[in-house]
Amino acid sequence: DISIANELIYERAKFYKENYPNTDVIIGDIKEKIIFNKIIDKSKKNKIDFIITTPPCQGMSTAGKKDKKDPRNTLINEAINVIKKIKPKYVFLENVPQQLNTFVRHNDNEILIPTYLKSCLKKYYNFSSDEIVNSANYSVPQNRTRSIILLTRKDLKHIWNPPKKHKKIITLKNAIGNLPILDPLVYDIPFEKHLEIFPKYEKRLNKAISISKWHNPPKHVLRQVKVMIKTPTGKSA
């Protein structure tokens, strides 16, 4: 169970709380002393022995500008400070693969994040190898790569390393193929025109929502829908 979580934005915290109602979600900027101290105090009170840290990746993601001066890159400092204050048994550090090649400024020097982590925490922790992990190799129906660094406190005998890859690949069809079919919501045309193209839209939507509120139609422009309709199963456009 996740005992304590921190989120900057209220709407995201509310969504997280809906999924994990028993978690104490602390809302606010971890860079602010009052928020940081609240996290530390509650963590110590709850005797936290495992920390998951995933600092925002926009400053290093290939989908973003990869701005070296992006202040979000420096949130790794707060993660390190929390770890040093709590000293949990295990730490799970996750981010985009570019984390392994991203520099942060420390003592007026540019230093790679993995090197920085080790310089700050090697006194207390053993590190797993800096691995790029693909979720598809662990029964997740998504081809998604991430940098995963696992830390084990030095007083523990068991060293935490990534598990062996699963032999079977799970496809999206394997995972959700049993759910009711949905038609897309085409938002760049009048709704009447949309219903002419997808006359079963509302009937299928009602059936899907009766099973899960999360099973609702994706929103697309008509051009995208036409391309996807003509894209064979198992292929990408």
Predicted regions and their residues:
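Generic alpha-helix structural propensity
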Residues: 8-11, 25, 34, 46, ...
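Class I S-adenosyl-L-methionine
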Residues: 40-45, 57-237
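SAM cofactor-binding core of SAM-dependent methyltransferases
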Residues: 1-32
